[in-house]
Amino acid sequence: MAKGASISGFPEWLPAERVVEQRVIDTLREVFELNGFIGIETRAVEQGSSLLKKGETSKEIYLLSRLQEVGHESDIPVEQRLGLHFDLTVPLSRYVVEHSGALPFPFKRWQIQKVWRGERPQEGRFREFVQADIDVVGDGTLPSHYEVELPLVMVNALERLREFGLPKATVHANNRKLSEGFYRGLGLTDIEGVLREIDKLDKIGPQAVTDLLVETCGATEAQANACLELAQVTAEDGQELIEKFNGLCEIHHIPFDGDEYAMAKEGLDTLSMIIDEARRIRPGSVMADLKIARGLDYYTGSVYETFLEGASDLGSICSGGRYDNLATQGNRKYPGVGLSIGLSRLVSYMLHRAGATASRMSPACVLVAVWDEENRGDSNAIANTLRSRGIAADVAPTAAKLGKQIKYADKLGIPYVWFPNENPENDGSDEVKNIITGDQRPADAQSWQPDTVYAQQTVSINADNR
Protein backbone atom coordinates (compact mmCIF):
# COMPACT_ATOMS: atom_id res chain seq x y z
CA MET A 1 0.00 0.00 0.00
CA ALA A 2 1.32 3.45 -0.89
CA LYS A 3 2.35 5.70 1.96
CA GLY A 4 -0.24 8.40 2.61
CA ALA A 5 0.56 12.07 2.24
CA SER A 6 -1.31 15.10 3.51
CA ILE A 7 -3.01 17.31 0.91
CA SER A 8 -2.87 21.03 1.55
CA GLY A 9 -6.25 22.53 2.38
CA PHE A 10 -7.98 19.25 3.19
CA PRO A 11 -7.80 18.89 6.98
CA GLU A 12 -8.21 15.66 8.93
CA TRP A 13 -8.73 15.85 12.67
CA LEU A 14 -7.22 13.31 15.04
CA PRO A 15 -9.77 11.43 17.20
CA ALA A 16 -9.50 13.79 20.18
CA GLU A 17 -9.74 16.81 17.85
CA ARG A 18 -12.81 15.30 16.23
CA VAL A 19 -14.41 15.19 19.69
CA VAL A 20 -13.98 18.98 19.90
CA GLU A 21 -15.49 19.44 16.44
CA GLN A 22 -18.44 17.20 17.30
CA ARG A 23 -19.14 19.14 20.50
CA VAL A 24 -19.18 22.36 18.47
CA ILE A 25 -21.60 20.82 15.95
CA ASP A 26 -23.84 19.51 18.73
CA THR A 27 -23.89 22.92 20.43
CA LEU A 28 -24.78 24.78 17.23
CA ARG A 29 -27.50 22.30 16.35
CA GLU A 30 -28.99 22.64 19.84
CA VAL A 31 -29.12 26.44 19.58
CA PHE A 32 -30.55 26.36 16.06
CA GLU A 33 -33.28 23.90 17.00
CA LEU A 34 -34.11 25.84 20.18
CA ASN A 35 -34.94 28.69 17.81
CA GLY A 36 -37.18 26.57 15.60
CA PHE A 37 -34.84 25.87 12.69
CA ILE A 38 -35.32 22.62 10.75
CA GLY A 39 -32.31 20.53 9.73
CA ILE A 40 -31.71 19.47 6.13
CA GLU A 41 -28.86 18.05 4.06
CA THR A 42 -28.42 18.71 0.35
CA ARG A 43 -26.44 16.83 -2.26
CA ALA A 44 -22.75 17.64 -2.66
CA VAL A 45 -22.98 18.60 -6.35
CA GLU A 46 -24.86 21.23 -8.34
CA GLN A 47 -25.06 22.10 -12.01
CA GLY A 48 -22.17 24.27 -13.16
CA SER A 49 -24.65 26.83 -14.46
CA SER A 50 -26.07 27.29 -10.95
CA LEU A 51 -22.65 27.63 -9.34
CA LEU A 52 -21.24 30.10 -11.88
CA LYS A 53 -24.14 32.55 -11.87
CA LYS A 54 -24.09 33.10 -8.12
CA GLY A 55 -21.04 35.33 -7.98
CA GLU A 56 -18.30 32.78 -7.32
CA THR A 57 -15.25 32.86 -9.58
CA SER A 58 -14.77 29.79 -11.76
CA LYS A 59 -11.23 29.23 -10.44
CA GLU A 60 -12.66 28.39 -7.00
CA ILE A 61 -15.15 25.76 -8.20
CA TYR A 62 -14.22 22.07 -8.28
CA LEU A 63 -15.79 20.26 -11.24
CA LEU A 64 -16.39 16.50 -11.35
CA SER A 65 -15.11 14.19 -14.07
CA ARG A 66 -15.21 10.43 -14.49
CA LEU A 67 -11.86 8.85 -15.23
CA GLN A 68 -12.79 8.00 -18.82
CA GLU A 69 -13.68 11.66 -19.42
CA VAL A 70 -10.24 12.99 -18.50
CA GLY A 71 -8.84 14.84 -21.49
CA HIS A 72 -12.27 15.35 -23.04
CA GLU A 73 -13.74 17.79 -20.48
CA SER A 74 -13.56 20.64 -22.99
CA ASP A 75 -16.19 18.86 -25.09
CA ILE A 76 -18.77 19.57 -22.38
CA PRO A 77 -19.68 23.19 -21.55
CA VAL A 78 -18.85 24.08 -17.95
CA GLU A 79 -22.48 25.07 -17.39
CA GLN A 80 -23.56 21.48 -18.12
CA ARG A 81 -21.02 19.82 -15.86
CA LEU A 82 -21.41 18.98 -12.19
CA GLY A 83 -19.43 20.85 -9.56
CA LEU A 84 -19.01 20.59 -5.80
CA HIS A 85 -20.95 23.29 -3.97
CA PHE A 86 -18.82 26.15 -2.61
CA ASP A 87 -21.39 27.24 -0.04
CA LEU A 88 -24.76 26.07 1.29
CA THR A 89 -26.85 29.02 0.07
CA VAL A 90 -26.83 28.06 -3.61
CA PRO A 91 -27.94 24.46 -2.81
CA LEU A 92 -30.63 25.86 -0.52
CA SER A 93 -32.08 28.03 -3.28
CA ARG A 94 -32.32 25.04 -5.61
CA TYR A 95 -33.72 22.84 -2.81
CA VAL A 96 -36.45 25.36 -2.00
CA VAL A 97 -37.55 25.65 -5.63
CA GLU A 98 -37.57 21.86 -6.16
CA HIS A 99 -39.48 21.09 -2.96
CA SER A 100 -41.60 24.23 -2.57
CA GLY A 101 -44.82 22.24 -2.60
CA ALA A 102 -43.74 20.24 0.45
CA LEU A 103 -42.15 23.01 2.53
CA PRO A 104 -43.77 25.36 5.06
CA PHE A 105 -43.10 29.08 4.55
CA PRO A 106 -41.37 30.96 5.97
CA PHE A 107 -39.00 28.00 5.88
CA LYS A 108 -36.42 28.13 8.69
CA ARG A 109 -33.58 25.72 8.08
CA TRP A 110 -30.23 24.84 9.61
CA GLN A 111 -27.58 22.92 7.72
CA ILE A 112 -24.12 21.75 8.81
CA GLN A 113 -22.25 20.20 5.92
CA LYS A 114 -18.97 20.11 4.01
CA VAL A 115 -18.29 22.53 1.15
CA TRP A 116 -15.38 22.81 -1.30
CA ARG A 117 -13.65 25.94 -2.51
CA GLY A 118 -10.43 26.23 -4.51
CA GLU A 119 -8.87 28.93 -2.34
CA ARG A 120 -5.20 29.26 -1.51
CA PRO A 121 -4.79 27.27 1.73
CA GLN A 122 -3.50 29.19 4.75
CA GLU A 123 -4.00 29.19 8.50
CA GLY A 124 -7.70 28.78 9.19
CA ARG A 125 -8.61 28.64 5.48
CA PHE A 126 -9.22 25.31 3.79
CA ARG A 127 -10.32 23.90 0.45
CA GLU A 128 -12.60 21.36 2.10
CA PHE A 129 -14.36 22.57 5.20
CA VAL A 130 -17.57 22.43 7.21
CA GLN A 131 -20.06 25.28 7.20
CA ALA A 132 -22.93 25.80 9.61
CA ASP A 133 -25.80 27.80 8.12
CA ILE A 134 -29.16 29.13 9.19
CA ASP A 135 -31.58 30.73 6.73
CA VAL A 136 -35.19 31.81 6.61
CA VAL A 137 -36.81 31.71 3.17
CA GLY A 138 -40.19 33.25 2.41
CA ASP A 139 -42.70 32.70 -0.38
CA GLY A 140 -43.08 36.02 -2.21
CA THR A 141 -42.25 38.17 0.80
CA LEU A 142 -40.13 37.96 3.92
CA PRO A 143 -40.58 40.32 6.90
CA SER A 144 -37.57 42.45 7.81
CA HIS A 145 -37.67 41.33 11.46
CA TYR A 146 -35.80 38.18 10.40
CA GLU A 147 -32.85 40.44 9.54
CA VAL A 148 -32.56 41.09 13.29
CA GLU A 149 -33.47 37.63 14.53
CA LEU A 150 -30.91 35.62 12.55
CA PRO A 151 -27.78 37.55 13.58
CA LEU A 152 -28.96 37.34 17.19
CA VAL A 153 -29.38 33.56 16.90
CA MET A 154 -25.81 33.35 15.60
CA VAL A 155 -24.53 35.59 18.40
CA ASN A 156 -26.24 33.29 20.90
CA ALA A 157 -24.67 30.24 19.24
CA LEU A 158 -21.20 31.82 19.24
CA GLU A 159 -21.65 32.84 22.88
CA ARG A 160 -22.30 29.18 23.73
CA LEU A 161 -19.00 28.29 22.04
CA ARG A 162 -17.05 30.48 24.44
CA GLU A 163 -16.81 27.46 26.75
CA PHE A 164 -14.55 25.95 24.08
CA GLY A 165 -12.22 28.95 24.01
CA LEU A 166 -13.93 31.21 21.49
CA PRO A 167 -13.62 34.95 22.27
CA LYS A 168 -16.61 37.32 22.30
CA ALA A 169 -18.17 37.76 18.86
CA THR A 170 -19.71 40.93 17.41
CA VAL A 171 -21.77 41.10 14.22
CA HIS A 172 -20.94 44.03 11.91
CA ALA A 173 -23.89 44.89 9.67
CA ASN A 174 -24.47 47.02 6.59
CA ASN A 175 -27.15 47.26 3.91
CA ARG A 176 -26.51 46.96 0.18
CA LYS A 177 -29.24 49.50 -0.65
CA LEU A 178 -27.62 52.09 1.60
CA SER A 179 -24.27 51.59 -0.10
CA GLU A 180 -25.69 51.47 -3.63
CA GLY A 181 -27.74 54.63 -3.14
CA PHE A 182 -24.68 56.48 -1.86
CA TYR A 183 -22.46 55.24 -4.71
CA ARG A 184 -25.06 56.21 -7.32
CA GLY A 185 -25.42 59.58 -5.64
CA LEU A 186 -21.70 60.07 -6.24
CA GLY A 187 -22.24 59.33 -9.94
CA LEU A 188 -20.80 55.81 -9.97
CA THR A 189 -22.46 53.16 -12.15
CA ASP A 190 -20.45 49.94 -11.68
CA ILE A 191 -22.03 49.22 -8.31
CA GLU A 192 -21.17 45.51 -8.20
CA GLY A 193 -17.58 46.34 -9.01
CA VAL A 194 -17.39 48.97 -6.27
CA LEU A 195 -18.87 46.54 -3.73
CA ARG A 196 -16.35 43.87 -4.69
CA GLU A 197 -13.42 46.24 -4.24
CA ILE A 198 -14.69 47.69 -0.94
CA ASP A 199 -15.04 44.10 0.29
CA LYS A 200 -11.24 43.81 0.00
CA LEU A 201 -10.57 46.76 2.31
CA ASP A 202 -9.42 44.78 5.35
CA LYS A 203 -7.26 42.49 3.22
CA ILE A 204 -5.36 44.98 1.03
CA GLY A 205 -5.81 48.37 2.72
CA PRO A 206 -7.34 51.72 1.67
CA GLN A 207 -4.72 52.81 -0.87
CA ALA A 208 -4.92 49.56 -2.84
CA VAL A 209 -8.74 49.74 -2.80
CA THR A 210 -8.61 53.35 -3.99
CA ASP A 211 -6.38 52.33 -6.89
CA LEU A 212 -8.73 49.49 -7.84
CA LEU A 213 -11.80 51.74 -7.71
CA VAL A 214 -10.10 54.15 -10.10
CA GLU A 215 -8.60 51.51 -12.39
CA THR A 216 -11.42 48.97 -12.60
CA CYS A 217 -14.63 50.80 -11.64
CA GLY A 218 -14.18 54.10 -13.46
CA ALA A 219 -14.14 56.17 -10.27
CA THR A 220 -12.37 59.50 -9.96
CA GLU A 221 -9.98 60.04 -7.08
CA ALA A 222 -12.65 62.11 -5.31
CA GLN A 223 -15.32 59.43 -5.79
CA ALA A 224 -12.98 56.73 -4.53
CA ASN A 225 -12.15 58.79 -1.44
CA ALA A 226 -15.86 59.31 -0.78
CA CYS A 227 -16.41 55.53 -0.96
CA LEU A 228 -13.69 55.07 1.65
CA GLU A 229 -15.25 57.76 3.86
CA LEU A 230 -18.50 55.79 3.83
CA ALA A 231 -16.57 52.62 4.66
CA GLN A 232 -15.18 54.28 7.81
CA VAL A 233 -18.64 54.89 9.32
CA THR A 234 -19.55 52.76 12.34
CA ALA A 235 -22.37 53.19 14.85
CA GLU A 236 -23.94 51.33 17.75
CA ASP A 237 -27.37 52.99 17.68
CA GLY A 238 -29.72 54.04 14.90
CA GLN A 239 -29.73 57.78 15.50
CA GLU A 240 -25.94 57.95 15.48
CA LEU A 241 -25.91 56.05 12.18
CA ILE A 242 -28.50 58.32 10.57
CA GLU A 243 -26.65 61.48 11.60
CA LYS A 244 -23.30 60.21 10.31
CA PHE A 245 -24.75 59.04 7.00
CA ASN A 246 -26.75 62.20 6.35
CA GLY A 247 -23.67 64.25 7.18
CA LEU A 248 -21.71 62.43 4.47
CA CYS A 249 -24.53 62.98 1.97
CA GLU A 250 -24.40 66.72 2.68
CA ILE A 251 -20.62 66.84 2.28
CA HIS A 252 -20.79 65.07 -1.09
CA HIS A 253 -23.88 66.94 -2.34
CA ILE A 254 -26.24 63.98 -2.54
CA PRO A 255 -29.72 65.59 -2.50
CA PHE A 256 -32.17 64.26 0.09
CA ASP A 257 -35.06 64.46 -2.40
CA GLY A 258 -33.36 62.42 -5.13
CA ASP A 259 -33.90 58.81 -6.17
CA GLU A 260 -30.41 57.86 -5.01
CA TYR A 261 -31.02 59.03 -1.46
CA ALA A 262 -34.46 57.36 -1.45
CA MET A 263 -32.75 54.04 -2.22
CA ALA A 264 -30.10 54.66 0.42
CA LYS A 265 -32.72 55.65 3.00
CA GLU A 266 -34.54 52.35 2.56
CA GLY A 267 -31.36 50.54 3.54
CA LEU A 268 -30.58 53.11 6.23
CA ASP A 269 -33.98 52.61 7.89
CA THR A 270 -33.59 48.81 7.89
CA LEU A 271 -30.05 48.96 9.26
CA SER A 272 -31.06 51.44 11.97
CA MET A 273 -33.91 49.14 12.98
CA ILE A 274 -31.55 46.16 13.14
CA ILE A 275 -28.96 47.74 15.42
CA ASP A 276 -31.56 49.40 17.67
CA GLU A 277 -33.54 46.18 18.11
CA ALA A 278 -30.38 44.13 18.63
CA ARG A 279 -29.18 46.68 21.18
CA ARG A 280 -32.47 46.35 23.05
CA ILE A 281 -32.37 42.54 23.11
CA ARG A 282 -28.63 41.88 23.39
CA PRO A 283 -26.53 45.02 23.92
CA GLY A 284 -23.11 45.04 22.28
CA SER A 285 -23.85 42.15 19.92
CA VAL A 286 -24.54 43.96 16.62
CA MET A 287 -23.13 47.22 15.25
CA ALA A 288 -23.37 49.14 11.98
CA ASP A 289 -20.18 49.04 9.93
CA LEU A 290 -20.50 50.54 6.46
CA LYS A 291 -17.39 48.89 5.05
CA ILE A 292 -19.15 45.51 5.10
CA ALA A 293 -19.92 44.71 1.47
CA ARG A 294 -19.88 40.91 0.91
CA GLY A 295 -18.40 40.11 -2.49
CA LEU A 296 -21.07 37.64 -3.65
CA ASP A 297 -23.54 39.40 -5.92
CA TYR A 298 -26.73 37.67 -4.76
CA TYR A 299 -27.12 39.84 -1.65
CA THR A 300 -29.72 42.59 -2.03
CA GLY A 301 -30.20 44.11 1.43
CA SER A 302 -28.66 43.52 4.84
CA VAL A 303 -25.15 42.04 4.89
CA TYR A 304 -23.22 40.75 7.90
CA GLU A 305 -19.68 39.89 8.95
CA THR A 306 -18.74 38.63 12.42
CA PHE A 307 -15.44 39.23 14.18
CA LEU A 308 -13.88 37.81 17.33
CA GLU A 309 -12.49 40.06 20.03
CA GLY A 310 -8.69 40.00 19.96
CA ALA A 311 -8.53 37.85 16.82
CA SER A 312 -8.65 40.38 13.99
CA ASP A 313 -6.12 38.35 11.99
CA LEU A 314 -8.70 35.56 11.72
CA GLY A 315 -11.07 37.81 9.76
CA SER A 316 -14.80 37.22 9.65
CA ILE A 317 -15.92 33.88 11.06
CA CYS A 318 -19.64 34.22 10.30
CA SER A 319 -21.18 36.09 7.38
CA GLY A 320 -24.31 36.37 5.30
CA GLY A 321 -27.12 38.66 4.32
CA ARG A 322 -30.47 39.09 2.64
CA TYR A 323 -31.11 37.82 -0.88
CA ASP A 324 -34.38 38.57 -2.67
CA ASN A 325 -33.65 37.07 -6.09
CA LEU A 326 -31.54 33.98 -5.47
CA ALA A 327 -34.41 31.48 -5.60
CA THR A 328 -37.01 32.00 -8.33
CA GLN A 329 -39.56 29.85 -10.12
CA GLY A 330 -41.15 31.67 -13.04
CA ASN A 331 -42.69 34.81 -11.56
CA ARG A 332 -42.51 33.33 -8.07
CA LYS A 333 -39.70 34.53 -5.80
CA TYR A 334 -38.41 33.08 -2.55
CA PRO A 335 -36.58 35.86 -0.69
CA GLY A 336 -34.35 34.85 2.18
CA VAL A 337 -31.87 35.94 4.79
CA GLY A 338 -29.14 33.77 6.24
CA LEU A 339 -25.79 33.54 7.97
CA SER A 340 -23.00 31.01 7.71
CA ILE A 341 -20.30 30.02 10.19
CA GLY A 342 -16.99 28.71 8.90
CA LEU A 343 -17.03 25.86 11.39
CA SER A 344 -13.69 24.35 10.41
CA ARG A 345 -11.98 27.71 10.92
CA LEU A 346 -13.49 27.98 14.39
CA VAL A 347 -12.41 24.47 15.33
CA SER A 348 -8.89 25.17 14.07
CA TYR A 349 -8.80 28.30 16.22
CA MET A 350 -10.07 26.42 19.28
CA LEU A 351 -7.54 23.62 18.88
CA HIS A 352 -4.43 25.57 18.02
CA ARG A 353 -4.92 28.94 19.70
CA ALA A 354 -7.43 28.45 22.51
CA GLY A 355 -6.00 25.09 23.55
CA ALA A 356 -9.29 23.18 23.42
CA THR A 357 -8.76 19.52 24.30
CA ALA A 358 -10.99 16.51 24.80
CA SER A 359 -10.87 14.68 28.13
CA ARG A 360 -10.38 11.44 26.20
CA MET A 361 -10.45 10.23 22.62
CA SER A 362 -12.67 7.21 23.33
CA PRO A 363 -16.32 7.69 24.25
CA ALA A 364 -16.06 4.61 26.49
CA CYS A 365 -16.17 5.28 30.22
CA VAL A 366 -15.16 1.74 31.19
CA LEU A 367 -12.83 -0.90 29.77
CA VAL A 368 -13.84 -4.39 30.90
CA ALA A 369 -10.75 -6.53 31.40
CA VAL A 370 -10.48 -10.09 30.07
CA TRP A 371 -8.78 -12.70 32.29
CA ASP A 372 -8.46 -15.22 29.46
CA GLU A 373 -10.13 -15.76 26.11
CA GLU A 374 -12.28 -18.59 27.51
CA ASN A 375 -13.98 -16.03 29.76
CA ARG A 376 -14.37 -13.26 27.14
CA GLY A 377 -18.11 -14.00 27.10
CA ASP A 378 -18.32 -12.97 30.77
CA SER A 379 -16.58 -9.67 30.00
CA ASN A 380 -18.89 -9.06 27.05
CA ALA A 381 -21.92 -9.71 29.26
CA ILE A 382 -20.71 -7.15 31.81
CA ALA A 383 -20.13 -4.58 29.06
CA ASN A 384 -23.61 -5.19 27.64
CA THR A 385 -25.18 -4.73 31.07
CA LEU A 386 -23.38 -1.41 31.49
CA ARG A 387 -24.40 -0.29 27.99
CA SER A 388 -28.03 -1.17 28.65
CA ARG A 389 -27.88 1.33 31.52
CA GLY A 390 -26.41 4.07 29.31
CA ILE A 391 -22.79 3.63 30.41
CA ALA A 392 -20.40 3.52 27.44
CA ALA A 393 -18.21 0.43 27.76
CA ASP A 394 -15.54 -1.34 25.73
CA VAL A 395 -13.91 -4.75 26.19
CA ALA A 396 -10.15 -5.32 26.20
CA PRO A 397 -8.96 -6.51 22.76
CA THR A 398 -6.79 -9.32 24.17
CA ALA A 399 -6.36 -11.26 27.40
CA ALA A 400 -2.96 -9.68 27.97
CA LYS A 401 -1.47 -9.07 31.39
CA LEU A 402 -3.62 -6.70 33.41
CA GLY A 403 -0.90 -4.07 33.31
CA LYS A 404 -1.07 -4.00 29.52
CA GLN A 405 -4.87 -3.83 29.58
CA ILE A 406 -4.69 -0.86 31.95
CA LYS A 407 -2.12 0.83 29.68
CA TYR A 408 -4.47 0.30 26.74
CA ALA A 409 -7.29 2.01 28.64
CA ASP A 410 -4.97 4.85 29.60
CA LYS A 411 -3.90 5.39 25.99
CA LEU A 412 -7.55 5.79 25.00
CA GLY A 413 -8.22 8.02 27.99
CA ILE A 414 -10.77 5.56 29.43
CA PRO A 415 -10.94 6.40 33.15
CA TYR A 416 -12.22 3.07 34.56
CA VAL A 417 -11.06 -0.54 34.20
CA TRP A 418 -13.51 -3.25 35.26
CA PHE A 419 -12.12 -6.48 36.69
CA PRO A 420 -14.62 -9.38 36.47
CA ASN A 421 -14.71 -11.75 39.43
CA GLU A 422 -11.98 -14.24 38.60
CA ASN A 423 -13.71 -17.05 40.49
CA PRO A 424 -17.50 -16.63 40.11
CA GLU A 425 -18.13 -19.85 42.08
CA ASN A 426 -16.73 -18.10 45.17
CA ASP A 427 -18.47 -15.27 46.96
CA GLY A 428 -16.18 -12.60 45.54
CA SER A 429 -17.38 -9.68 43.47
CA ASP A 430 -16.29 -7.71 40.45
CA GLU A 431 -14.10 -4.68 41.07
CA VAL A 432 -13.69 -1.41 39.20
CA LYS A 433 -10.63 0.82 39.29
CA ASN A 434 -10.40 4.52 38.50
CA ILE A 435 -6.97 4.57 36.87
CA ILE A 436 -6.78 8.35 37.20
CA THR A 437 -7.25 8.49 40.98
CA GLY A 438 -6.15 4.93 41.80
CA ASP A 439 -9.37 4.24 43.71
CA GLN A 440 -10.52 0.59 43.42
CA ARG A 441 -13.66 -0.91 44.94
CA PRO A 442 -16.22 -3.72 44.54
CA ALA A 443 -18.88 -3.09 41.91
CA ASP A 444 -22.03 -4.60 40.41
CA ALA A 445 -22.75 -3.95 36.73
CA GLN A 446 -26.47 -3.73 37.53
CA SER A 447 -26.10 -0.73 39.86
CA TRP A 448 -22.64 0.87 39.57
CA GLN A 449 -22.44 4.50 38.45
CA PRO A 450 -19.28 6.35 37.39
CA ASP A 451 -18.39 9.64 39.03
CA THR A 452 -20.10 12.43 37.10
CA VAL A 453 -16.82 14.08 36.16
CA TYR A 454 -15.68 10.92 34.35
CA ALA A 455 -18.99 9.76 32.88
CA GLN A 456 -18.80 11.58 29.53
CA GLN A 457 -16.21 12.92 27.17
CA THR A 458 -15.72 16.61 27.90
CA VAL A 459 -13.90 19.49 26.25
CA SER A 460 -11.82 21.97 28.21
CA ILE A 461 -9.49 24.82 27.29
CA ASN A 462 -6.06 25.83 28.45
CA ALA A 463 -6.44 27.83 31.68
CA ASP A 464 -4.21 30.58 30.24
CA ASN A 465 -6.79 31.19 27.50
CA ARG A 466 -9.81 31.64 29.74
UniProtKB/Swiss-Prot annotation:
EC number(s) stated in the UniProt entry for this protein: 6.1.1.21
Principal location listed in the UniProt entry: cytoplasm
Localization: Cytoplasm
A single GO BP: histidyl-tRNA aminoacylation
A single GO cellular-component term on record: cytoplasm
Family to which the UniProt record says this protein belongs: Belongs to the class-II aminoacyl-tRNA synthetase family.
Name of the protein in question: Histidine--tRNA ligase
Organism whose genome encodes this protein: Bifidobacterium animalis subsp. lactis (strain AD011)
